UniProtKB/Swiss-Prot annotation:
Its main location: cytoplasm. The gene is phoU. This is Phosphate-specific transport system accessory protein PhoU homolog. The keyword Zinc does not apply. GO terms for molecular function: protein homodimerization activity. It comes from Aquifex aeolicus (strain VF5). Plays a role in the regulation of phosphate uptake. In this role, it may bind, possibly as a chaperone, to PhoR, PhoB or a PhoR-PhoB complex to promote dephosphorylation of phospho-PhoB, or inhibit formation of the PhoR-PhoB transitory complex. Homodimer. The keyword Transport applies. Keywords: Cytoplasm, Phosphate transport, Transport.
């Protein structure tokens, strides 16, 4: 019973961490759109909270293994949590990177409307949320949907890269802002990759199937 209680509390901490990551992505995107330096700095400072949560959750996992010597499903869940909090922490770092770029981009007028970037932001926030839920609830179907969304993010990233190249070719003075936007898009793309890792961990936890670096398709397709 003690293991069950501690494991449930640890799961709640993972969900809390995921929500903080989503908030960081949301605020970083808003800071970018509104050229709000103060909000961007808030994201940067808030990353410390995400880092501390990672350390706390990792310690909880080590404690549960040492104290209760869990087996089978409980052990897989604990080891899975230990792994995915690293991905969540990296997502927080990427949100911080977006905020740092937002500060640099606030120095000049926007190069273009951030339509694709905003779309990427919404998708990756959904991926973060759904990947963690799929892991906690061992929902393989939801995990596979998360993995499929990564292709959409990749396509948006490449589409934006082509568009930014056009801006640079039209006027070389655009290169600085285009470079910053390219990095911003790359940071979103990396968040999606980490969410995909979490979803893959969910599938392994539920089915025992290693799906890393594979394209997931529904059975029968």
């Amino acid at each position: 019973m003690k293991l069950f209680k501690e494991l449930e509390e640890t799961k709640e901490q993972v969900i809390k961490m995921a929500k903080l990551v989503q908030e960081a992505i949301d605020k970083a995107t808003e800071a970018l759109n509104k050229q709000n330096v103060e909000l961007a700095e808030e994201v940067i400072k808030g990353d410390d909270t995400i880092d501390l949560l990672e350390v706390d959750i990792e310690r909880r996992c080590i404690r549960m293994i040492a104290l209760y010597q869990p087996e089978a499903g409980d052990l897989r869940m604990i080891m899975g949590i230990y792994k995915i909090v690293s991905d969540l922490e990296r997502m927080g770092d990427e949100a911080e990177n977006i905020a740092e770029r937002a500060i640099l981009l606030a120095e000049e007028p926007p190069l273009k409307p951030y339509v694709n970037i905003n779309f990427m932001s919404e998708i990756v926030k959904e991926m973060v949320n759904d990947s963690v839920i799929s892991f906690i609830q061992q929902d393989t179907l939801l995990a596979k949907k998360v993995i499929e969304k990564d292709d959409t993010v990749d396509e948006l990233y490449h589409q934006l890269e082509r568009e930014l190249m056009t801006y640079v070719l039209e006027d070389p003075r655009n290169i600085k802002r285009a470079m910053h936007l390219s990095f911003v898009a790359r940071h979103y793309e990396r968040i999606a990759d980490h969410a995909e890792n979490v979803a893959e961990a969910a599938i392994y936890l539920s089915e025992g199937e290693i799906v890393k670096h594979q394209h997931i398709k529904e059975k029968g397709e």
